[in-house]
Amino acid sequence: HGNDTRDWCLYDFNGHTSHMAHGALLETLRIAATGEGLVASWALRPGSPDTAPVFDVRLEARPGLAPDPLLPFIESRVVQRRAMRTTPLTPAQRAALAAAPGPGYTAQFFESSAERKAVAGFLWRSAYVRLICPEAYPVHKEIIEWRTRFSKDRIPEQAVGVDAATARLMEWVMASWGRVKFFNTYLGGTIAPRIQLDYLPARACAAHVLIRADVPAEGVEAHVRGGVALQRVWL
């Protein structure tokens, strides 16, 4: 049983972000099932609402089934929002990433210094809108759990991607929209988080990968399958 957050989350346009998250979960389930010798398949239950889609999952024993190659990475893969090495992708790495989303999707790579700089500039500008938007403030306040490394249902502070000093300042400022607006207007409050969360990681990496559907996604199931493809690339 799924649900979406469009009623309170600015980023969940028409619930499609949540639908993609459902796809990521279903693909993780499918991969994990192979470790138990099971084939997992799913179908969107007809008539279930877009805001609360229901997925029927079927598990079938398959003796001799080989574990999915992505199985070991379910528990080890983590979000990394800090600067990384700029070592270019090898042909094998690029080929693996290109094949990961499966049929119906194309991977586009932005690898050169100029391309990464362009992406960084785009993220720098879009982050400004994100950080000054009053409608986004309640979302940011809700989803971060401060002073922790792990969280059951939110983004833990150590996964946000800022240094300790910036984290303490952000925690205090984000206690009220009035503080956020004052800092953004008069004290350059967007600069430090944009540098640390957007610009530097965008420049200091091997590549950016854009996953494009060969056919524009329409409806819940198409976005769920987009989440399946994205999860395979991420793992």
Task: Indicate where each model-derived feature is located.
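Acidic, surface-exposed loops and disordered segments
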Residues: 1-235
